[in-house]
Regions:
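Acidic, Ser/Thr/Pro
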Residues: 1-204
Length: 204
């Protein structure tokens, strides 16, 4: 990455979460190490507990549920927080909430299954306390969903390869948390939950 140097590298273990602080002007690179893995991303403006990345506001900002290179992620205050500058996968989900404990109980009858919401909650411990957490605040990176003719949500097995990545320019000082999704009851992660990596780049 020309004119940038690696500032921090964070490995997010399979079915776990990780968090990092970003500065305006940084670039964040999210890498799927083994392929076919979904990462659920939440973000908050660093100096505010009342402003966070909002999928709903992002949809209306771009007038699309499909985010592409050149599109912006925005906050609940409608400020641009990230800009997508590279993406070699091309499919993501911004409609469905991240998985939580209740989803595994109600859908599959499984108690105490790991979930993206719990992964993100754990990742924030010791990094940032008191942040607003809710499943609908997640962007499901590399998740291959589509909406059918009748409006139904169709979950498809991902097809992206190892080392697939997306890179975003950071536009506001922010805090991010990423869950390497632990969903193993559907083909969401290719039936094999695996690790992800966050690379943070700064200008030289």
């Amino acid at each position: 990455m020309d004119n940038y140097q690696l500032k921090n590298e964070l490995l997010v273990p399979a079915s776990k979460g990780g968090a990092a602080i970003l500065e305006n002007g940084d670039r964040i690179e999210i890498v799927d190490v083994e392929g076919k893995q979904v990462g659920d991303l939440m973000a908050w403006v660093l100096d505010s507990k009342k402003e966070w990345f909002s999928p709903a506001h992002t949809i209306t900002h771009n007038w699309s549920i499909n985010l592409n290179v050149g599109d912006f992620l925005v906050t609940n205050m409608r400020r641009e927080i990230f800009k997508i500058i590279y993406d070699d996968v091309g499919y993501h989900d911004i409609v469905v909430p991240c998985c939580d404990n209740e989803a595994y109980i109600r859908r599959y009858g499984i108690e105490n299954h790991r979930s993206c919401l719990e992964n993100i909650r754990e990742a924030l411990v010791g990094v940032a306390e008191g942040r607003h957490l809710s499943g609908e605040l997640a962007w499901n990176i590399f998740m291959k969903n589509k909406i059918g003719i009748g409006g139904e949500m169709i979950y498809e097995a991902p097809s992206h390869k190892p080392s697939s990545k997306i890179i975003m320019e950071v536009l506001l000082d922010s805090l991010i948390a990423l869950s390497a999704c632990p969903q193993d009851q559907t083909p969401t992660n290719g039936w094999n939950c695996s690790e992800m990596k966050i690379n943070i780049w700064e200008k030289k």
